[in-house]
Amino acid sequence: DAKLIFEMASVGGDVRIRSRFAEMMRLVAANRQLFPNKPWQGAPSLVADFRVDRRPRRFPKRERLPADILAEHGSVLGGSQLRQDLWRALTAREGMKLAGFQERAALRLSAATDDGGTIVTAGTGSGKTIAFYLPGMIRIGETISTDHWVKAVAIYPRIELLKDQFAEAFRMARTIDQTLASHGRRPMMIGALFGKTPTRATRQELTDKTWAQRGEDFVCPWMRCPRCDNELVWRAVDIAVGTERLACVQPNCGQEIGDDQIVLTRTSLQRNPPDILFTTTEILNQRLSDHWMRGLFGVGLTSARKPLLALLDEVHTYEGGTGAQAALTLRRWRHLLASPISWVGLSATLGDAARFFSDLTGADLDDVVEITPTLEEFEEQGAEYQILLRGDPASRASLLSTTIQTSMLLPRLL
């Protein structure tokens, strides 16, 4: 059923077995430059040679029980009953264990770093996001009260990544709702500021921001239902009265998200700022010059209402001209804040991560710490494959054609 093995008839009539990966490589190596209404038999070949690299896939071992970590480091993680309860709520998932680097990140980030920096480097799927949000939500949660101000700004280089992490942060925030309520505090609020964030709750505004429609309702472009993963819509009846509320399109689900948990419009971002604000480097650069919106990032506010944390994801992508522009924006924001903030970066492995992050944010190199899994903390699990293709110079086809044809072929094989 998984189509991992194929039966291939040979010229002599025998049946031969070929794995899906081997069949994929055969098709990739035989790739040709195709055009509409032209026979493929005479089309130029695109691949002259290939190499396959297979290596064990290595992940950080997750062996540490959250309860043991709290017991060993109670003075750091659990300085108050609220902090202890938040830790237990965030780590209550059955069977949850933490890796060594996640534990070290939690210990460092659970307290203020006085304008210092922390960069967490690990491979994809290693749990870097948890390494930030676990201690981050403890610090944010203990400062929540009846008033509203942005306590953490999460900055992303790409909108799609912002959407993924927004959903994950929202799910984590909901795990501590009861804990916060038991301590007399409101739920944690999350908001997003990027191109599709409407200014106000009107049908025309949502249309202008290219929100997709489902009948009379509008589909939220940056979040799906946390319960069943269906679309969330802003109902026409709620838009008409200016109520910011999302509802799942699946009738049997019944999930609703109100304005005490999510902020949908720029006007509401100004009126009731969220506890965590998701944005992009481009929007940050634009809004720092906007006197109506710059207060959302802590500019011009008292020191007690300025962000505690600044998260930068995919730090390794900030290179070249794009990286220089991002660094200028971050240093400008840091100067305008004129107040200590804990810089946190998440990244793939970098050669000199601490110096790279210091150059990016302007934080003093002596105050920047890299947290990464040690060699002893890895375990092998599965395998990863890398395929290198060399274009065929004899065909006079560009490497771009090879890239396009291969990109079209691979999704049909995976």
Regions found by a protein language model. Give the residues of each.
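SF2 helicase catalytic motif II
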Residues: 274-277, 282-288, 292-337
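Conserved helix-turn-beta segment of the N-terminal RecA-like "Helicase ATP-binding" lobe
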Residues: 161-258, 358-368
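Conserved Walker A/P-loop ATP-binding site and its immediately adjacent core
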Residues: 130, 149-175, 191-201, 282-286, ...
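N-terminal accessory nucleic-acid engagement/regulatory domains that precede
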Residues: 1-89
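Conserved pre-motif I regulatory segment
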Residues: 63-121, 130-138
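Conserved interdomain linker/interface between the two RecA-like ATPase lobes of SF2 helicase motors
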Residues: 204-226, 350-414
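Post-DEXD/H (motif II) to motif III coupling segment of the RecA-like Helicase ATP-binding lobe
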Residues: 316-377
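Conserved SF1/SF2 helicase motif Ia
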Residues: 117, 138-167, 176-186, 335-340
